[in-house]
């Protein structure tokens, strides 16, 4: 089991880097920046992710009277947005990939400055090093994305050849990562039963989906992407802060459990959206 746990960081690295490279090879800089010109949509995305979700997490914690450590884990996820898995969810759901990438980058950059400012207000004793968060997100996500975009712009033939390989690597590493997380954390998930932690994860995910959908504007694609993007939190940033700041292991366990619960719900929803679109050409979200 210890060996499997050690394989998770390496598998995560392969998944994130290969996914970001493949995304860059599939898009142009103009396609990524275009959705961000819609100032109203950008403001609504920031409202959903950095106002509604942090205070939503805080409210769920109080409503369910969670153990303090479990509540801290939930609030950590509420303040951490910009997940590398969002573009993959958008691909599965067959929705607007360019907006998904643009939203991911926007939320990730804001998270770097947002968490150190807001967490001490919501959690007593919390302190966050923005440099450590920024370093991991820039090196693992922004840099590979930039390399892919540059290669797409300068070497289109090579980019077209490399992208299918990276797509396969990304898909296989995602499957492996999901299995590893569940196998190595199964006992931790069981320990959460009876604490209302799993219920909190379900409520948190449903709240995020609803907030993103309602604030996503008139376009069906933007509503779907913002719903998925608001519900899929930045697990890496939440784990980084949880491990460095809090001594109680239940904080990290709660982050993992809520992330796993949310991932299952979002994968099912994304697959349903894709199947519905394939059958009718219309997505019901």
Task: Set out the residue ranges of the language-model regions.
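Alpha-helical transmembrane segments of multi-pass small-molecule/ion transporters
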Residues: 1-285
């Amino acid at each position: 089991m210890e060996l499997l746990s050690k394989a998770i960081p390496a598998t995560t690295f392969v998944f994130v880097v290969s996914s970001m490279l493949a995304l860059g090879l599939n898009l142009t800089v103009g396609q990524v920046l275009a959705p961000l010109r819609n100032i109203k949509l950008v403001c609504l995305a920031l409202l959903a992710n950095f106002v509604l979700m942090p205070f939503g997490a805080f409210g769920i914690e109080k409503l369910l009277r969670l153990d303090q450590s479990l509540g801290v884990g939930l609030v950590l996820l509420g303040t951490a947005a910009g997940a590398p898995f969002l573009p993959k969810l958008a691909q599965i759901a067959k929705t607007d990939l360019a907006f998904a990438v643009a939203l991911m980058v926007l939320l990730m950059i804001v998270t770097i400055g947002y968490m150190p400012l807001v967490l001490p207000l919501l959690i007593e004793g919390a302190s966050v090093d923005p440099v450590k968060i920024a370093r991991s997100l820039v090196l693992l996500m922004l840099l590979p994305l930039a390399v892919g975009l540059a290669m797409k712009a300068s070497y289109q033939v090579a980019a077209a050849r490399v992208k299918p390989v990276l797509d396969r690597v990304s898909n296989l590493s995602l499957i492996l990562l999901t299995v590893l997380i569940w196998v190595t954390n199964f006992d931790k998930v069981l320990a959460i039963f009876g604490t209302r932690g799993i219920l909190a994860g379900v409520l948190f995910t449903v709240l995020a989906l609803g907030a993103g959908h309602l604030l996503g504007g008139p376009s069906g694609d933007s509503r779907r992407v913002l719903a998925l993007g608001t519900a899929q939190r930045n697990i890496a940033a939440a784990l980084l802060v949880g491990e460095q700041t809090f001594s109680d292991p239940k904080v990290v366990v709660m982050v993992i459990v809520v992330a796993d619960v949310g991932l299952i719900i979002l994968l099912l929803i994304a697959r349903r959206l894709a199947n519905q679109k394939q059958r009718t050409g219309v997505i019901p979200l």
